[in-house]
């Protein structure tokens, strides 16, 4: 689990997301509270439940990006899912309990990677020994003379220096279990997983011989030895524990399962049903998975939605009560667009410069050029649908279409994108509202 303070978390998010300070602060506090809870007296820990968050804001302002970046910072089991993918129990489609099953699988992968990282040195030594045994076989009986320890050490030294990397050897590897593809209707993933495991276990453990270079053999054998040193049963127990104590679920598009007041009765039956099915998970219940029972009492849920056609009050009252922290994200301004284009280390401007540089052509953006691109994006958003920062992708792609097409023929040249260049390539489209609706 991350031990970063709220201030450090916000600073890290600032590198990738412009503005939205209120949302960043709420998420940072929620993440820090996970750590704080683990520090209090054990008798009090079960009583401290997470304060779930509802993020409200138009599309393209950074709700999903905050979730993506949070996943990397959290170092905890994290899953991002769209609420629209699920249906009420009894209808065709995935039921909400599959969220927890997927979360446990993610946690097992995370814990296994950490465990294998811890035994890397032991695995590397074991892999070296296996390669040395192939190149310099040990004595098979007491009567045979064993190669001197000195020869083996000399060979080990050469191996570590990389002098034997290109030599080809034949190694015996564990064969991958036979893959069986089973097709099943949505919502039956648990059954198909169990059937696949059953078929894989039929064959038992088999080995196969492969010829490869020493360098490649060391890598493959190191992974195999690391997997051998890791206890799967311990991994599963630790993964379930992590899910119960530290996991975070990001529920996107929660507004799409709202039933609007003006719709009256009838309509989409499974919408409200999805909300009712989510209730036990968010409130705290026990979900059965193939790795054991998982309690959801201390899983943090962060829900988000644009709420264009509905309001947070259209959620069923019980679910509203389970999302006590409300954060409103602001629509982006021209100045925000300028910062989005220039400040992040992997901004759109830097991405296009790196792509065009591969052709030997230098792409340069002036300050007034970047501002003009931001103004065009904001203008198109205000005239047509406001899709936030995603509009920048469309505008930039249209602006640099000619350069991208002819970059291979412009090796050694420098192309400067200033305000005049932007007006020349996009001015007509921005003025013509009908064209901008379809093209930008």
From Swiss-Prot:
Keywords per UniProt: ATP-binding, Chaperone, Cytoplasm, Nucleotide-binding, Stress response
Region feature (Disordered): 138-159
List of residues binding ATP: 18, 60-65, 252, 318, 390
Superkingdom, taxonomy of origin: Bacteria
Compartments reported by the entry: Cytoplasm
GO BP annotations listed: protein unfolding; proteolysis involved in protein catabolic process
GO cellular component, one term: HslUV protease complex
Entry annotated with the keyword Cytoplasm: yes
InterPro entries: AAA+_ATPase, ATP-dep_Clp_protease_ClpX, ATPase_AAA_core, Clp_ATPase_C, HslU, P-loop_NTPase
GO molecular function, one term: ATP hydrolysis activity
Main location: cytoplasm
Keyword Chaperone: yes
PANTHER family registered for this protein in UniProt: ATP-DEPENDENT CLP PROTEASE ATP-BINDING SUBUNIT CLPX-LIKE, MITOCHONDRIAL-RELATED, ATP-DEPENDENT PROTEASE ATPASE SUBUNIT HSLU
Subunit composition and interactions: A double ring-shaped homohexamer of HslV is capped on each side by a ring-shaped HslU homohexamer. The assembly of the HslU/HslV complex is dependent on binding of ATP.
NCBIfam families: hslU (TIGR00390), PRK05201.1 (NF003544)
Family: Belongs to the ClpX chaperone family. HslU subfamily.
Described purpose of this protein according to its UniProt entry: ATPase subunit of a proteasome-like degradation complex; this subunit has chaperone activity. The binding of ATP and its subsequent hydrolysis by HslU are essential for unfolding of protein substrates subsequently hydrolyzed by HslV. HslU recognizes the N-terminal part of its protein substrates and unfolds these before they are guided to HslV for hydrolysis.
The protein's name: ATP-dependent protease ATPase subunit HslU
Organism: Alkalilimnicola ehrlichii (strain ATCC BAA-1101 / DSM 17681 / MLHE-1)
Name of the coding gene: hslU
């Amino acid at each position: 689990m991350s031990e970063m303070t709220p201030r450090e978390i916000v600073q890290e998010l600032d590198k990738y997301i412009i503005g939205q300070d209120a949302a960043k602060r709420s998420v940072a506090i929620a993440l820090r509270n996970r750590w704080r809870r683990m520090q209090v007296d054990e008798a009090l820990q079960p009583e401290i439940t997470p304060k779930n968050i509802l993020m409200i804001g138009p599309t393209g302002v950074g709700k999903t990006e905050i979730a993506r970046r949070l996943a990397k910072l959290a170092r905890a089991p994290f899953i991002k899912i769209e609420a629209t993918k699920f249906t009420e129990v009894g209808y065709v489609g995935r039921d909400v309990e599959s969220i927890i099953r997927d979360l446990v699988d993610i946690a097992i992968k995370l814990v296994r990677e950490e465990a294998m990282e811890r035994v890397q040195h032991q695995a590397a030594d074991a892999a070296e020994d296996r390669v040395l045994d192939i190149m310099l076989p040990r004595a098979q009986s007491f009567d045979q003379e064993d190669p001197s320890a000195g020869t083996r050490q000399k060979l080990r030294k050469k191996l570590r220096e990389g002098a034997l990397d290109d030599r080809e050897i034949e190694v015996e590897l564990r064969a991958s279990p036979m893959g069986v593809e089973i097709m099943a209707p949505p919502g039956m993933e648990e059954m198909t997983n169990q059937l696949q495991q059953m078929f894989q276990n039929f064959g038992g453990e088999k080995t196969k011989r492969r010829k490869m270079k020493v360098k490649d053999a060391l890598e493959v054998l190191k992974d195999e030895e690391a997997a051998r040193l890791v206890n799967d049963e311990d991994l599963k127990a630790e993964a379930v524990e992590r899910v119960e104590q530290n996991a975070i679920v990001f529920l996107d598009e929660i507004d799409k399962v709202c039933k609007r007041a003006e719709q009256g009765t009838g309509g989409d039956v499974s919408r409200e049903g999805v909300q009712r099915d989510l209730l036990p998970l968010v409130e705290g219940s026990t979900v059965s998975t193939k790795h054991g029972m998982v309690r959801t009492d201390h899983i943090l849920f962060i829900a988000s939605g644009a709420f264009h056609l509905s309001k947070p009050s259209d959620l069923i009252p019980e679910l509203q009560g389970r999302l006590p922290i409300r954060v409103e994200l602001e629509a982006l301004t021209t100045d925000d667009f300028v910062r989005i284009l220039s400040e992040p280390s992997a901004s759109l401007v830097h991405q296009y410069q790196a792509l065009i540089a591969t052709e030997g052509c230098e792409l340069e953006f002036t300050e007034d050029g970047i501002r003009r691109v931001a103004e065009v994006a904001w203008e198109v958003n205000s005239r047509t649908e406001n899709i936030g920062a995603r509009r920048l992708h469309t505008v930039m792609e249209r602006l640099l279409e000619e350069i991208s097409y002819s970059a291979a023929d412009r090796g050694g040249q420098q192309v400067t994108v200033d305000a005049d260049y932007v007006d020349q390539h996009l001015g007509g489209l921005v003025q013509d509202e009908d064209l901008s609706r379809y093209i930008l």
